[in-house]
Every structure is written in C-alpha cells, then in structure tokens.
Amino acid sequence: CTFCSYSRLIKKRSEGWEYTLDEIMDIVRSFDNKPVTEVHIVGGVLPQYDVKFYVNLFKAIKAHRPELHIKALTPVEYHYMFKKDKVSYAEGMKLMQDAGLDSMPGGGAEIFAPEIRDQIAGGKCSGDQWLEIHEIWHNLGGKSNATMLYGHIENYSHRVDHLDQLRRLQDKTNGFQTFIPLKFRNENNQLSHLSEVSVVEDLRNYAISRIYLDNFDHIKSYWPMIG
C-alpha cells in the first residue's frame, strides 16, 4: 500500500521479519504471569501463512491458555488465504471460528470507494469483499471492529460513502463493536508528499463519525495515529 511505512518487498526483504508459529507462541507464553485477556494478531499476506497455519496457531493458543480472547486478522489476510487455499469465505471463517477465533479487528478497510482504494491499496481485497467477510463473520455470531483511513487523497464524499456502507451493514447484522478513524501519517511512505490534516479536521471527523454511526456503541481514538 502506498501509505504503508513498514512493509518490505523482495528487494529489501532482509529488513523485514516474519514469525513462525513457535515464535508467536513464545510471545504468548511470555505473558503467562501477567493479567492479559486478549491476543491481537495481524500480519501481511505471505504464502506460508495459509489456512492451516492460522488454524494450528489459534488452536495452540487456546490449548495453552483457553481464556485468552483471540482477535485476529483482517479481511485482507482472510481473502488472500481463502483464495489461495480454494475455500469460500463462509467455509474459511467457520474454520477460523472452530479453531478459536473470537473476534476480528477493523483493519484493511482504508477507503471503500474503488477510485481511491485502487490508488492507495491496489491488490488488496475490494471494499465489497471487506464488507462481505465481516457480514459472514457476524452471521456466525462473531463480533468485529471497523476502520476508515482518512486525510490522504480522498474527499468528504468518499468518507461519507464509507461511513454509510458501515452503517448499513451494522443495521443488518449489529456485529460491529467499535469504529476507529485512522489518520493518515506521511512519514516514510509513498505518499510523503501529502500534508497531514489538522487537529481541527481530526476532531470534525470524529464528531461526524459519532453522529452518523449512531448504531455503533463505541468510537475509538487510536493513539499511534492520533496521539
């Protein structure tokens, strides 16, 4: 994605890193004596991270510490692995649920409008696919969050369209718990030539989100983006 400041492609692969299942479990075990209630897992779309990998990971976490709530992966990752492993969204999400998935984070939404999404996040699942995977998860009884990346090349109409699609799905499923506006940060990415929006614009965006998404219980301020 053009707004990403941490991904590393093949030419700079040595600067990147990836965890094995055992390494992830070592991280989980490092919190054994601490009052942790949730493990939050997100990552990239790498070939070795397939359906089997995550099924085994979720099962391992639950076997080690059954009370931990697993909030894991966005539709971007699910779309990639389900397509690669030739399983439907419904089949794939049921496999994840049976393995121990408790909820989904809200990442990967960016902006749903194709004319913007194709420019900033080409190659990711579409906005419609993002919404479809969340709807399937909600229909399985699962809960999830939603996000919107703002302050880049989109305009107000794109933001309103994004909020409207979330609101309509929430009216249908009531499966979203929290909406998280994500402010575009321009350091170390392909959109560094863009200025960041003002704090006043941030406040306006939060206010409009709270008013319009009256069917969402929570609006969250994400400190790495807004702090």
Model-derived features with residue positions:
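Glycine-rich, proline-tolerant flexible connector loops at the mouths of alpha/beta enzymes
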Residues: 8-12, 42-51, 114, 186-190
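Short, acidic/polar
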Residues: 21-30, 87-95, 163, 227
